[in-house]
Amino acid sequence: MKKIFVSIASYQDPLLLETICSAYENAKYKDFITFGVCEQSSNGIDLDNIKFKNQIRYELIDPVMAKGPCYARSRIQSLINDEDYYLQIDSHMIFYQGWDEILIKYFNWLQQQINSDLVITGYPRSFKANESLDEFELNIKYKDTLGITFREGRIFEDGHYSMQKSYPANTDLPVQGLLVAGGFIFSCLLYTSPSPRDNRV
């Protein structure tokens, strides 16, 4: 089995530990998962109480010194070692059982379909957490693929950010896109390593 590097940038997020544990516990090949975490928080997670702490490369930054997610993701990239795949996520996610095997198989299938370099990206489904943050309800109301595009007339307009909108793609299969969602990126490290995150953004 090939190795996956999971990049998690976090800013004072109470779900960070749940995210890490969900990824580990639901991975089919747990020994092949490595986490790179940059936590911008007053009180970091307690690594000593995590049974797989040797699989976590961790940096804690005082929130006063925080410079946003791109800065944190840039720092995380320096923690990559000999992994084969790169998964960049937000610090408030839950994972499906066997997600690691599913993603790698899906990536390999897509490679065969388009015969080109690629990244899998998108907005993960939302979920609701209970007060103790140990039970989650996944939003599964819409099951087809939604494409993402720019709003006409709002692309690089002075005084405005480039607004996006989603549209039904009328399929449950993936669609080619022109945008990347920073909260979920999966690819072969061979493709993602030449695209470093700019720590000045």
Where do the language-model regions lie?
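Single conserved hydrophobic/aromatic residue that forms the stacking wall/gate
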Residues: 191-201
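Catalytic cores of eukaryotic secretory-pathway lumenal/extracellular enzymes that build
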Residues: 3-193
